[in-house]
Amino acid sequence: MLWIGANTDYNTNFPLPEVLRMDKAPLEYQYFKGKVPKDSDVHGFYNLKDKTIYIRGEYPIEHPWSQGLILHELLHYVQDMNNVKFKCVAEMEKDVWPLQKKYLKEVHNFDWNYDQLWYMTISSCGEY
């Protein structure tokens, strides 16, 4: 939360949410409420209803990728707690991906070079 507070304008004065680690199959079952698409590859999500962060557990918790996933979902928690409004769900990702990339580099010296076209696609509202 300290890193988020220092690198964003969000209020971070909230209790930390619960973080649950799960294997891929149960995590995706939870995320999709039982109707998991064949090509799914969910790494984590923040549940608005129970204020819980769910992440895949294949990496040790101290691994940079696990830390990056937690930060990513923690940013969604902070967006929620700050009552940030979005035009669509995808728009929630617009600030989060670059912040996750920055965090991974600054804190863990981990380079995450995601595809910019993919980022634009998953972080923009559009007519689908």
What are these regions (language model features)?
Residues 89-124:
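Post-HExxH zinc-binding segment in Zn-dependent metallohydrolases
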